[in-house]
Amino acid sequence: MKRREFIRNTAAGLAALAAARPHSAKAENPKYKVAVIGRTGRGNYGHGLDVVWNNVEQAQVVAVADEDAKGRAAAAKRLNAPRAYADYRLMLEKERPEIVSVAPRWLDCHRDMVLACAESGCHVLLEKPMCQTLEQADEMVAALEKKNLKLAIAHQTRYSPTLQHARRLLMVLGTHVMDLMRLFAGDPQWCFARVRENGKPITRDDVRDGAEGIGPLAGDEIHVMYRFGEPTMGYFSTHRAKDGAAARFGLRLYGTKGVLTTTTGALPEVWFVEDPSWQPGRSKARWRRISSNGIDQPETRTDPGQSFGNRLIALDLIRAVETDTQPKGNVYDGRAALEMILAVYESHRLNAPASLPLKTRVHPLTLL
């Protein structure tokens, strides 16, 4: 090969490599350029997915986008963002951030915002749930995979130091066990569910548009059974809000040697009892607390405004970017959790167990 051809081909190869390489902090600028997308009045900024970056020293917020003028000005002030935009697409084009918080809580915008971020080559921190349908989720996964981009979804409990102790304990309790079920038990194989409204099975007439851009919704009573790997089963039941509903929300795991209960969040309340009968009232076995410091240790951490959990997610997203691995709660986990939810309606529609992954990618309620 001639010298001129060698130089030309080498330059072309380096250019292609640079284009394919995921964004990372440069030596001359160790801070990641972060942008925030919010939507005041229609999902706002989620559960603190904007201010989390104020507590991440490896990152610097360079801009915020919000279609609402007052909300935009307020966000720019609390984030110390030097620039603010009404159009998030224009912000992505002008600022070229490396990481973007897609913060609105409402789901009707998640798909479009994430696709725009992927097109601009940005990694994403996304408010949960992921989106409205599996069809949208598949599009998001494909767009991120195309450019080797990472997405972390704000399922805080996955990052909990408390649950790290709990997962180790499950081995002792003998457990071979929608996101927390998968965290402990893996992917479900099938789902069987019944959905009722006013005491009767739902029909097309019961389908309505859910609040906060959630998409189609139906039912005020849901009962679900999931089959995980042998011999593990999972059960989920819910009714329209009744007295004490918030206090009952959580997950309970039954193993051959005991029971573990947990709430959600980065610092959940976790208790376990070593009792093969699962009847501690009869056996007199004592419930024991698990904190982020371990078994029977007092909890010394706090999480005001969910800032502790959000920071864990943001730091793990940066770790994933730098190591070219997946975040603990990634785009595939977000899609799988959504699939478990939509499998409920698909099983009801079929009046039979629905195998997972679902073949139906549109919302099952639109097919009733």
Give residue ranges: language-model regions.
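Twin-arginine (Tat) signal peptide motif
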Residues: 1-7
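C-terminal helix-rich "cap/oligomerization" subdomain common to oxidoreductases
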Residues: 7-29, 99, 302, 316-368
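N-terminal Rossmann-like dinucleotide-binding module
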Residues: 13-79
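Internal alpha/beta domain cores that form substrate/cofactor-binding pockets in large enzymes
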Residues: 33-35, 61-66, 70, 79-87, ...
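Active-site loop of classical SDR/Rossmann-like NAD(P)-dependent oxidoreductases
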Residues: 70, 302-314
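Beta-strand-loop-alpha-helix segment that lines the small-molecule cofactor/substrate pocket
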Residues: 99, 105, 111-156
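Rossmann-like NAD(P)H-binding beta-loop-alpha module
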Residues: 161-169
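Contiguous beta-strand/loop segments that form the cofactor/metal-binding neighborhood of enzyme cores
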Residues: 172, 176-275, 311-327, 343-344, ...
